[in-house]
Every structure is written in structure tokens, then in C-alpha cells.
Amino acid sequence: MASAKEDNKHQGVGIVGAGLVGCLTALAFAAKGFSVTLFELRPDPKKVTNEKNLRSINLAVSDRGIRTLKYVDSEMADRVLEHVIPMTGRMIHDLSGTKQESQAYGLFGESINSIDRSFLNDYLLDEIRHSDINVHFNHKLIRLDDLSSEEKSPKLTFLDTSESNESTMKSYEFDYVIGADGAHSQFRYQLQKSMRMNISQEYIDMQYLELSIPPNTTGDSKFHIDPNHLHIWPRHEFMLIALANEDGSFTSTFFSPWSVIESFGTSSDKFIDFFKYNFPDAFKLMGEKKLRYAFENQPRGSLMQVNAYPYHNPNGRALIIGDAAHSMVPFYGQGMNCGFEDIRVLMELIDKNNGEVSESFRQYSVLRAEDLQTISKLALDNYHEMSSKVTNVWYLFRKKIDNMLGRYGNGLFQWIPMYTMISFRGDIPYSKAIKIEKRQTKILNAIEVGTLTGFILFGAAKLAQHYHKLSNK
């Protein structure tokens, strides 16, 4: 490897990571007139012909994500939303494969929106290509220097692997630097060397395997199953989900503890038998050949949570954002929405502080911490709801009462169901939503106890009446 140091000084903002959050952060700063440079470890996707990477779990874009897209560029947001598929609720598939039950998400027909991760990332990159933002692919972050200095600008040093025959070291200086390079953030690793940062990382005992349902080529619809639902096959310990794509296919994901997938060893026959028994209708739609290929060739993905704090360095020149600061499991559909909301919150602080970025970085850490801790916990808790509770009689009863109070008692009781607050009310911070939910849960518990007591008393009265009749014979 040849090593030739090249120093390029760019006054403005340097952003590491050209994923969804990194791209939208770059567009947001550029819209405010900052000089922006974006760096990405991977090659330019336009020049890559191999298969997309492991992270193809479809995204569910909801109100928080849409608000940020519109904040950055309302016309761009409209163009993105032309490619989503609205999902008005969950469709629960039973074990027999013959019964489906729809469970609405919103009170008044609101929807979350399915969109392909790769499409959205590529679209944002295309927006960047048509802007004044500088983009450098094949840049691996090696060092982050001069963060504590008031006289010097933060310096990012990369290994540039874009040349076919050799790699070179390149350094760039900026007024401000931002890490948006995901859960395994190298930026965060370098940042914590120069400050006291609390970091927790937890792997969840859960794996995911990507599967797919092909388009329907014979019927009137290009979709085999209803595209306007998030399909769930809940089986308590494990589950299968499927979200529609524009071409008529469905991106499907099998989630299970590692012990389940590892129990099959290398035997695709065991996996096929397992799948055929637990998801019979999905098995017919996917086909044995594709399932066998997926088991034998698709990598298993790990799920982990990362939480760091504070998100900024002491002098307010560096910040981590998105998964680099708060990676979460995907079970509430809020990972990208939360990351996008990070951007809007930061931009609004910059507006409030008249363009003072350092002060905005400092305020961001304080303002955002409780919300991010809240949604990380909610995301993990929601796995139990998706895999088990959605078929529980008492859960469904509580859900009906919750929705009824939300629909008819919002004015009188200020009642808003939890899912509505998280997915459809981006004006309510996550931390405020959980406080409202705690109050409402106490009321629901009282209603549940009262109902159960009523059933018991009614049953006891009927039994006593029956006994009285028998004794009088």
C-alpha cells in the first residue's frame, strides 16, 4: 500500500456515512448554505453490480420521517412518497394458513408506508449528486484529530481505496464533523478517545433471515396478498413478517432466537419442514426452491442495541447522529424515522440559535437523550407484542377499548393510543408519549379488572340461580 498524505481544507461540515441518515443530514446542512462533504466507506452504488447487502429489511416511513423529509425539501419529500405503499394495519396469519385478521394501525385510517431501503438510499444519493455537496466513496475513517483544540479545526483522516492499484491516506479539515456511520460507528470509536462518553452495546438473542414473496404473474393483481398491510405470522418465540414492494413482490423477514435457526444445522430439509408447518400459506407463496436457496445462501443478521451519551464533544465541534448514537431493534419501525427526526431536531436548534452550530450540538444532547432512550426500549418491547400479544384475547380487548377511547374520548379525556403517538404524531416527543401511556395504562388496567370482575360476578350469579332451581326441585 502506497501512503501519500494529502491535506484538503474545506470550511464547513464533514459528514461520515452515506446511509439514509448521513445523506439526509448532508442535504439538510446544504439547504442552510453550509459547505458539505460526505464520506462513505463503501463504493458508489452506481458502480456496484453485485447483490445488495444484508440490510434489506423494508422500511416503514411514518410521520416523524415524513416531517423531516418535508422540512429539508418538501418537493423531494413528495417525490419520495410517490414510491411508498401505504399500510393501514397488520394482517395476522394463523397457524393453519387459512385465516387472516386485520388489525388497524390508526384511529381514522392512518397508515405507515412501506419503502425499499436501497431505493430510498439511492434516491437521496441522486439528490446529493445534483447538489453542491462533495461526495467521497471508498473512504475508510482512520483518525479524528484536533477535537479539543480551540485554534485548530477538526481533522478527519481516511484511507482512500478508490484507486484500483493503491490506497492513500487523505486528511480533511472542517468547522464541524458529524458521524452518521451506523451502529458499528468508527466515528464514534474515534470520538470517544477524546472525551468521556458513556456507551452501552447489547446483542439481542435474535437473528433475522431475509426471504421474499415473488410478484403474482397470473392474477388481476400483481400482489399475492394485500399490499396495504404489514403481514405478520406470529408464533410466540419466532415470527415472519412481509412488506410489499412496488413491483408486486414482498420483502419478508424471518426472526427467531439463534437457537432455533441453529437447531437446523446445515440441513435445509429441516428448515423446509419447519417452515411448511409454521407458515403454510407463506410457504406456498415463496416456494420450496427459493426457501431452500435462502437458507443455504443468505447470511443471518444479528440484532443489537447501542446507546451512547453525550452525542457531542465538549467544545461542540463534533456530533454523532442516527444509529451511530442510538441503534435500536426494528420492531417498532422507528429506526430510520427516529434517525430522520434527529436531523429535524438538530436543524430546528440551529435555526433557534441563529446558525450557531456548536451551541446547537450541546443543546441537542440534552434535548434528545430521554427521547432516544425511550424509543430504544419501546422497540425492544414491541417484539413481544408482534410475536405473541397480537393473538391474545385480553390484548385485543384492551386494544379495542384503547382505540374506542382514542376515537371518541380524545376531546374529553385527551386520550391518544400509544401507537398513534409514536407513528402518527411526530409533534409528541417519544418521552412524552410514554408518560401519557403510563397514565392511560392505569385506566385500562382498571377497566380490565372491572370487566373481569363483572364476568366473575355474572357467572357466580348465574351459577347460584342454577343451583337454586335445582334445590327447589
Curated annotation (Swiss-Prot):
Cell compartment(s), UniProt: Mitochondrion outer membrane
Signal peptide start and end residues: none
Pathway: Cofactor biosynthesis; NAD(+) biosynthesis; quinolinate from L-kynurenine: step 1/3
Residues annotated as transmembrane: none
GO CC annotations on file: mitochondrial outer membrane; peroxisome
Keywords recorded for this protein, A-Z: FAD, Flavoprotein, Membrane, Mitochondrion, Mitochondrion outer membrane, Monooxygenase, NADP, Oxidoreductase, Pyridine nucleotide biosynthesis
GO biological process: 'de novo' NAD biosynthetic process from L-tryptophan; anthranilate metabolic process; kynurenine metabolic process; L-tryptophan catabolic process; quinolinate biosynthetic process
UniProt cofactor(s): FAD
SUPFAM superfamilies: FAD/NAD(P)-binding domain (SSF51905)
Catalytic reaction(s) noted: L-kynurenine + NADPH + O2 + H(+) = 3-hydroxy-L-kynurenine + NADP(+) + H2O
InterPro entries per record: FAD-bd, FAD/NAD-bd_sf, Kynurenine_monooxygenase
Enzyme Commission number, as recorded: 1.14.13.9
A GO term, aspect molecular function: kynurenine 3-monooxygenase activity
Family: Belongs to the aromatic-ring hydroxylase family. KMO subfamily.
HAMAP family in the cross-refs: Kynurenine_monooxygenase
Function: Catalyzes the hydroxylation of L-kynurenine (L-Kyn) to form 3-hydroxy-L-kynurenine (L-3OHKyn). Required for synthesis of quinolinic acid.
PANTHER family per UniProt: KYNURENINE 3-MONOOXYGENASE
This protein's name: Kynurenine 3-monooxygenase
Organism the protein comes from: Debaryomyces hansenii (strain ATCC 36239 / CBS 767 / BCRC 21394 / JCM 1990 / NBRC 0083 / IGC 2968) (Yeast)
Lineage, uppermost ranks: Eukaryota, Fungi, Dikarya, Ascomycota, Saccharomycotina
